[in-house]
Amino acid sequence: DFEETMEFVERSQIDAVAPAIGTAHGIYHGVPKINFELVEKLGKEKTPVVIHGGSGLSAETFTRLIELGGRKVNISTLVKNAYLDKTKELVLSGEKFAPIPFDTEVENAVKEEVKKHPEVFSGKRTSF
């Protein structure tokens, strides 16, 4: 609710607000129903809007949320999954790795995943 959120912002004097807009932490089971109208209303206010639970959202959804006023996006689950997926791949490969090369492989996989997002968040890329 816009009025309730703004009352909270004003009373708490927070620096940024992460409203309940239909996103969720973790992995989505189905397509989330995003309250774009609330993001748009809050995006016109001076307090920056934070999008929590960004992992799994489409590039189109990110673009729309940012255009409407989203100023910070959290994608922690996505980063953690890149880490876990590469770790699992390397362990199951049966190949023997020394710790440093193993860590480097995992780190590079995470970097590659993370690199995709600034382009989407800035509007230079329309898909992952």
Language-model segments: which ranges?
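Short C-terminal domain-edge/linker segments immediately following a structured domain
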Residues: 47-50, 80-82, 104-107
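Alpha/beta enzyme core
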Residues: 1-45, 59, 63-68, 81, ...
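A hydrophobic, small-residue-rich beta->alpha segment in the mid-to-C-terminal subdomain
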Residues: 66-96
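Generic, low-specificity signal for short hydrophobic/alpha-helical stretches with a mild N-terminal bias
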Residues: 21-24, 47, 69, 95-99, ...
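Flexible, active-site-adjacent loop/turn segments at secondary-structure boundaries
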Residues: 19, 26, 55, 77, ...
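Extended, intrinsically disordered, low-complexity segments
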Residues: 89-128
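Glycine- and other small-residue-rich loops at beta-strand/loop junctions that grip anionic moieties
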Residues: 28-31, 51-54, 76, 106
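Hydrophobic faces of well-ordered beta-strands that scaffold small-molecule active sites
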Residues: 17-19, 49-53, 71-75
